Amino acid sequence: MSLKLKITAITPYPVWVGIRNQFLLKIETDQGIVGWGESGLSGREKAVAGAIEHYTKFLIGQDAMQIGRIWQEMYRSQYFEGGRVLQAAISAIDIALHDIKGKALGVPVYELLGGKQRDVVPAFASTGDAAGEGAVERAHELRAMGFDAIRFFPIGQDSRDIFEPRQSIAATARILNRAREELGSEVVLGIDYHHRLSVAEAASFCNKLDKGVLDFLEEPIRDETPEAYESLRTMTDIPFAIGEEFSSKWQFIPYIERGIHQFNRLDVCNVGGLTEAMKVAGWSEAHYVDLMPHNPLGPICTAATVHFAAAVPNFAWLETRAPETALGFDNSEFFPVQPKLEGAVYPVSDAPGLGVEVNEALLAKQSFKFWEAPHLKRTDGSVTNW
């Protein structure tokens, strides 16, 4: 006998939690089972809320258990399909539907994705706001906490106004060379340049590093043109970590099939939810690309990604913050039950659904605050990437 749960309400909560807004979504059903999702398009929450309003018009009354069909209807039932705003909305809805289905069947979400392939999910941590020589000291602290994969940020990353790439790459290369010398060869070291470099600047940066210093270089340049990454690929043998901004399996095609990147940074809250993430994971597995999911948001995103990571074979590390409370996104007053690090790993929850509890009454009291990412300029006054 089939189990049907009719969608009765969809409520977005774009609210301030920690240092930024979180876009949370609640879906209710006629049998009292609710699900929670999260969108990853930080800074454009109002746009996502508008898309959710459009989808709500035809989702009310549908069977929440038919996740794949609903995904296809949201994506295909319009002429101007896809794009980051719509996919961020689809992601939140898709994650919430998985939460509902898991609760309805009494199983954790990973069971809906094929079952658990690992008991714990290894994580990598970042040096955070620590700058310059302080980043190396922070890396030592992370090692002492048990992390064997550590990500650095470039010199100038924390600037709110000026970022000069050429100045950054020289100083950052010196710091990374020192870090490798002090930390040894066992630890995995990477850096996220947040697509702030040109091909020439990225190549120059790689050439300033000693051999074997970096295990991955994340988002050195913008991703709109795969051929640009192919050009950079010929200039360095450092593995690339790319994909946190991608909003569909189609956007991953050239990167996976041309062997451009070695670590796939997909974001379940941007790519189209767990439904789309599993398709990207399979494609990546076929081309021996490891998964290294983007996870910069709140506990809903973390929980969904932990279930995803548990269910796929080709997994490397999950992004985390150490300590998790650093930015306030995991505020336990809002999320009394949520994934928690144990050392440098996330245990995989066996609770039905995502395994997250949300204090909706407190959430409803919070307001939305407009937040804008820094608008960076070079020293000559020209605009550059954040």
Model-based region annotation:
Residues 30-105, 386:
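Metal- or metallocofactor-binding catalytic centers and their adjacent structured scaffolds
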